[in-house]
Amino acid sequence: MDSSNPNAVPGPTEWTEARHGVGPWEGEWPSNPRYDETLLREGDTRNVVDAYRYWSLDAIVADLDKRRHDFHVAIENFEHDMNIGTVVRTANAFLAKEVHIVGKKRWNRRGAMVTDRYQHIRHHKTVADLAEFARGAGLTIVAIDNTPGSVPLEAAKLPKRALLLFGQEGPGVTDDAQRAATMTCSIAQFGSTRSINAG
């Protein structure tokens, strides 16, 4: 919110000084069907921005779907990577169109902090399956890995309909992922660790 304008109305992703969550709705209930009667009656302690307080899950997803960006995010999960939940949460924060998990179907949802409920998630058994989906959807695969020859992300000209493909902690993107990608971008790092949490 613009602190220089005391009359400014906060946007959907701006926070107030209030505690996390709100109590039961005070006064007459709104009649709009996007509101959830249980939340109106009992209060809403979910980790959602204030604009979505008391809304049903389906109403929130429908509203997000009107505004999602064109890019997709994918992460390989051949070794049961523990970072996938964080990737899902970050994809939600940046309003990615979809998240794709490649490899094992099971993943650790803890890091997602229930944002997986608001994010479209698709599973692919192999990188080849992901590449086939990308071709059909008109998406350009861009691998993200700190490898020789990669283009620094801050200098790259990414296609609007990009599918950002992250590898796993440790091995990075697989050879199959490198071959499926049109380009590989790196994320600049200045500390001692070789990799960062993809989320």
Where in this protein do the model-derived segments appear?
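Post-transcriptional modification and biogenesis factors for structured RNAs
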Residues: 1-199
